[in-house]
From Swiss-Prot:
Protein name as it appears in the record: Chaperonin GroEL 1
One GO CC term on file: cytoplasm
Subunit structure: Forms a cylinder of 14 subunits composed of two heptameric rings stacked back-to-back. Interacts with the co-chaperonin GroES.
Disulphide bridges: none
Xref: Gene3D superfamilies: GroEL (3.50.7.10), GroEL-like equatorial domain (1.10.560.10), TCP-1-like chaperonin intermediate domain (3.30.260.10)
Gene Ontology MF, one: unfolded protein binding
Organism listed in the record: Rhizobium johnstonii (strain DSM 114642 / LMG 32736 / 3841) (Rhizobium leguminosarum bv. viciae)
HAMAP family, A to Z: CH60
């Protein structure tokens, strides 16, 4: 086992604080409408320019192991906030730094760290309660656009694109952000359920110009196994032919004799048909087939349920107004599943999202939820250069997450004003002087956001805080973009409650841990052993007479 270096008490905390400061100082320059960019060197390709706090935090790794521990703890604040709320990473970092700094001073003055922590926890709970009471629910598309604009650093077009996307696919719908090949940013909306499987044979195409198979008022056969034997499919094919309606087959695969016969029938015009592979793999494939069944009002033909393909009747098939199949994707529009069944399935998937601990599983469940709940919108981000596109994509990702958070829990006045106002509303009392000091640490830390935004805008922080607090109105604040004072909500400067709340709770949680640290252990760097010397040369040839 490698030797370790241990630091105690004040020395440990000072080292840790230095690491916290280095990371937080790099991140906090990005805060606010006049926040600056940070350039990150990449081992390949052009440097990355970003104003996204978590992207900056993730790049920081310090040489000193003890300083690095402090930096990594604050990085954890940014990452956790990003995972839960999708935005507010810079806010969380600034708050964590402010609480750690003030807490460190209090510990150095001889106060009990555990009581300070209890005081901090009491104050944070009180502030969260105050914020929840002040939050305003979002109802209009304009309010959604406002939140998006603020998070995208004042880019109105981004706000409008996000508002339009949410209007079209619903609050639960999937909105993805991709890099475009053009200079313009555009929005594309896919209604209905889309999955990434195309037709199994180009002979199924009905529109040769676009290479798409369009089926109207269609029956859908869902089968979880491979279909290779034609005999077992004949009864259901004959039943569908008699209705004169088209049929879509979704199965693990359709191959051999079965596929050949379907293609021949399609070409002869006897049967309007198309076949695609089922989406996903393993258990996820079963779940997605079940989703399609619920959406279209059909049944998945599965041996688990004891249903044989030979005994399938028309009422076991799903129905949809339209199915559109390209080489890569299949879109089912307006399935005829019962609304109550779809709502039940949506509730079930939401419960699974709450329970899962895997980010990957959560992402896949959210995709399934969106496909059932409304549709998919894609924002394609354009720009003149690759660097510009990446920077813009970062901002749109943040704006999208902030907007979702705002729809969930409502909005509060932005620009750090909600927290500044809450600092004057903390009424909770500590059980002793040290807990009271912990409460005061939070009071002072809540001013740090407005101060930092003002500093980044080139204004005097103390004057800004003073002017805002002089006027006792919840929404009255400071607009750093124009250096004016007024009603923040009326000016469209709002923050999602979920983002502000998550940032504060995570910052206080990690900062409390840092304050209560008394010892730090790190591995000593390995001493490189010096390489062996060169072997000696040949000795002199003494004693030999030269002839």
């Amino acid at each position: 086992m490698a030797s370790k270096e241990i630091k105690f008490g004040r020395t440990a905390r000072e080292k840790m604080l230095r690491g916290v400061d280095i990371l937080a100082d790099a991140v906090k320059v990005t805060l606010g409408p006049k926040g600056r960019n940070v350039i990150i060197d990449k081992s390949f390709g052009a440097p990355r320019i970003t104003k996204d706090g978590v992207s900056v935090a993730k790049e920081i790794e310090l040489e000193d192991k003890f300083e690095n521990m402090g930096a990594q703890m604050v990085r954890e604040v940014a990452s956790k906030t990003n995972d839960i709320a999708g935005d507010g990473t810079t806010t969380a970092t600034v708050l964590a730094q402010a609480i750690v700094r003030e807490g460190n001073k209090a510990v150095a003055a001889g106060m009990n760290p555990m009581d300070l922590k209890r005081g901090i926890d009491l104050a944070v709970a009180d502030v969260v309660k105050d914020l929840q009471a002040k939050a305003k629910k979002i109802s209009t598309s304009e309010e959604v656009a406002q939140v998006g604009t603020i998070s995208a650093n004042g880019d109105k077009q981004v706000g409008l694109d996000i508002a339009e996307a949410m209007q079209k696919v619903g609050n639960e719908g999937v909105i993805t952000v991709e890099e475009a090949k053009t200079a313009e940013t555009e929005l594309e909306v896919v209604e209905g359920m889309q999955f990434d499987r195309g037709y199994l044979s180009p002979y199924f195409v009905t529109n040769p110009e676009k290479m798409i198979a369009d089926l109207e008022d269609v029956f859908i056969l869902l089968h979880e196994k491979k279909l290779s034997n034609l005999q077992s499919m004949l009864p259901v094919l004959e039943a569908v032919v008699q209705t004169g309606k088209p049929l879509l087959i979704v199965a693990e695969d359709v191959e051999g004799e079965a596929l050949a016969t379907l293609v021949v029938n399609k070409l002869r015009g006897g049967l309007k048909i198309a076949a695609v592979k089922a989406p996903g793999f393993g258990d996820r494939r079963k779940a997605m087939l079940e989703d399609i069944a619920i959406l279209t009002g059909g049944t998945v033909i599965s041996e688990d349920l004891g249903i044989k393909l030979e005994s399938v009747t028309l009422d076991m098939l799903g129905r949809a107004k339209k199915v559109s199949i390209s080489k890569e994707n299949t879109t089912i529009v307006d399935g005829s599943g019962a609304k109550t069944d779809i709502e039940g399935r949506v509730a079930q998937i939401k419960a699974q999202i709450e329970e899962t601990t895997s980010d990957y599983d959560r992402e896949k469940l959210q995709e399934r939820l969106a496909k059932l709940a409304g549709g998919v919108a894609v924002i394609r981000v354009g720009g003149s250069t690759e660097v510009e596109v990446k920077e813009k994509k970062d901002r749109i990702d943040d704006a999208l997450n902030a907007t979702r958070a705002a729809v969930q829990e409502g909005i509060v006045p932005g620009g750090g004003i909600a927290l500044l106002r809450s600092s004057t509303k903390i009424t909770v009392k500590g059980a002793n002087d040290d807990q009271e000091a912990g409460i005061n640490i939070v009071r002072r830390a809540l001013q740090s956001l407005v101060r930092q935004i003002a500093e980044n805008a080139g204004d005097e922080a103390s004057i800004v805080v003073g002017k805002v607090l002089d006027k006792n109105e919840d929404n009255f604040g400071y607009n750093a973009q124009t250096s004016e004072y007024g009603d923040m909500i009326a000016m469209g400067i709002v923050d999602p409650l979920k983002v502000v709340r998550t940032a504060l709770q995570n910052a206080a949680s990690v900062a409390s841990l840092l304050i209560t640290t008394e010892a730090m252990i790190a591995e000593l760097p390995k001493k490189e052993s010096a390489g062996g010397g060169m072997p000696g040369g040949m000795g002199g040839m003494g004693g030999m007479d030269m002839m």
